[in-house]
From Swiss-Prot:
Upper classification of the organism: Archaea, Methanobacteriati, Methanobacteriota, Thermococci, Thermococcales
Amino-acid positions noted as binding Mg(2+) 1 in the UniProt annotation, renumbered to this chain: D6, T120, D121
GO cellular component: cytoplasm
Protein name from the UniProt record: Uridylate kinase
Gene: pyrH
Cited function: Catalyzes the reversible phosphorylation of UMP to UDP, with ATP as the most efficient phosphate donor.
Length: 225
């Protein structure tokens, strides 16, 4: 299979870089890449939001703040490249053609953000569509898609299986600003819906056994037509 992994910055760098998790996810990705083609997109997380909050004090535009976030995602991507060592494509990939070339070289391309207005969720969904991937795996700080934000609504229930259209109903009303964070952002949900790509949303614990996840054995949410 060809698989794109979308790793949230809040998972990789919650407050500071989670060295143990970075080592573990690098090991898991390396093992999966022995039998499958793998590409990765890394988010900015809290660090990106901290920088964006400071930029707001200077009345920076949303586009300018997006550029700040993109730089942080690429710094996070470099940490994962360091952990993947020789298995990774040696530089942060900045466009889909380069990612495709890296996959052909049997390397793992690691991307951050690309363009203002696109979250890394959207980048991952677009990359999966571009590469004609068989599977998109979203690793986030919430262990699946819920009927509402479980951090704000105690009655929220996890959805084990859903169609892309149902995902759009849940997340499609959001307005994305620089540094916005949701389990999957509206643009990514639209791309997932139009491409029909099978998507799995999991939390940090499930990410410790990616072979099990890609076989469908996980505690998260599966999204497919």
């Amino acid at each position: 299979m060809r698989i794109v992994f979308d790793i949230g910055g809040s998972v990789l760098v919650p407050e500071n870089p989670d060295i143990d998790f970075i080592k573990e996810i690098a090991y898991q990705l390396t093992k999966v890449s022995e039998d499958h083609e793998v590409a990765v997109v890394v988010g900015g997380g809290k660090l990106a939001r901290k920088y964006i909050e400071v930029a707001e004090k200077f009345n920076s535009s949303e586009t300018f703040k997006d550029f700040i976030g993109i730089q942080i995602t690429r710094a996070n991507a470099m940490l994962l490249i360091a952990a993947l060592r020789e298995k990774a494509y040696p530089v942060v990939v900045e466009d889909f053609w380069e990612a495709w070339k890296a996959v052909q070289l049997k390397k793992i391309p690691v991307m951050g953000g690309t363009h203002p207005g696109h979250t890394t969720d959207a980048v991952a969904a677009l990359l999966a569509e571009f590469l004609k991937a068989d599977l998109l795996v979203v690793i986030t700080n919430v262990d699946g898609v819920y009927t509402a934000d479980p951090k704000k609504d105690p009655t929220a229930k996890k959805i084990k299986k859903m169609k892309p259209e149902e995902l759009l109903e849940i997340v499609g009303k959001g307005i994305e600003k620089a540094g916005s964070s949701s389990v999957i952002d509206p643009l990514a949900a639209k791309i997932i819906a139009r491409s029909g790509i099978k998507t799995i949303v999991i939390g940090k614990e499930d990410a410790k056994d990616l072979f099990r996840v890609i076989k469908g054995d996980h505690n998260g949410t599966t999204i497919e037509p």
